[in-house]
Design a protein with these regions (language model features):
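Conserved Radical SAM active-site core
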Residues: 98-117, 121, 136, 140-225
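A structural signal for short, well-ordered beta-strand segments and their strand-loop junctions
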Residues: 48, 71-73, 124-125, 179-180, ...
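Glycine-/small-residue-rich active-site loops that bind phosphorylated ligands and cofactors
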Residues: 54, 130, 187
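Cysteine-centered iron-sulfur cluster-binding motifs in ferredoxin-type domains/subunits
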Residues: 125-135
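Flexible, acidic/Gly-rich N-terminal and inter-domain linker regions that tether
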Residues: 2, 7-8, 12-121
Length: 226
């Protein structure tokens, strides 16, 4: 699906499946849903912005990528993202973007079930909630009530939390590992919001830090010069 005015494509893998699913229902549901299923709004046609998230560089950058988007001011991202009665799969066919300012905590200890990387200093953070993709096997479908995407624009707060933790590691002789794509595919967002490249530059300033970026995206050209 092509977002007008953005100059790039956002993957949309569910519209066809959703259409087939809806049209297979009873005639009443089919009659009501058919025009909407066929004519979804483009992805990110609407961007919700927390009132406290406007004065950030990432907010300005993101809004500049979508000059035709309808911008809606909200009090808190959960008012939209966590509201009841949402349909994850339908929303995936017309995703909306939510820009928010995260509050503490900015860093979480990793579960004992994850790979240890040979160090006890393993953490994750959540600069983005949800994903552009909609993989059948992904746990996010059962984790979030919404198919929309939340981006936390106060990236410096995430990095400051890591700086503090580096001074109080469980084992200071071993590196700290932080997964920055635990609840998203951050690399898939790089042409929209260049978070991966910013995190790479941050890691270059640290001596005892490794970040993990898990991705199925092929947008490596977007970080070649980082």
């Amino acid at each position: 699906m092509q977002q007008k005015g953005s100059g790039f494509e956002i993957p949309n893998y569910t519209a066809r499946n959703c259409k087939q699913k809806c049209l297979s229902q009873n005639s009443t549901v089919t009659k009501y849903l058919k025009p909407f299923v066929i004519n979804f709004q483009p992805n990110f046609s609407h961007i919700y912005v927390e009132r406290d998230a406007f004065d950030f560089e990432l907010t300005d950058l993101t809004l500049s990528k979508f000059p035709r988007a309808t911008v809606i001011k909200i009090g808190h991202y959960k008012d939209v993202f966590n509201r009841p009665g949402q349909d994850f799969q339908i929303q995936k066919s017309s995703m909306k973007l939510i820009l928010a300012k995260k509050t503490e905590p900015f860093l979480y200890p990793a579960s004992d079930m994850v790979q240890e990387f040979g160090t006890p200093n393993v953490y994750y953070n959540t600069p983005i909630l949800n994903c552009l993709y909609n993989c059948d096997y992904c746990y996010l479908q059962g984790m979030y009530p919404s198919g929309n995407v939340v981006v936390f624009v106060n990236e410096n707060d995430f990095m400051d939390a890591i700086d503090l933790k580096l001074n109080e590691l469980d084992d200071p002789l071993k590196p700290m590992v932080v997964s920055i794509s635990y609840n998203t595919d951050i690399m898939a967002m790089e042409n929209i919001i260049p978070m991966t490249s910013r995190w790479i530059k941050f890691v270059d300033t640290q001596e005892n830090l490794t970040i993990e970026v898990r991705t199925k995206s092929a947008l490596f050209s977007s970080i070649n010069n980082t």
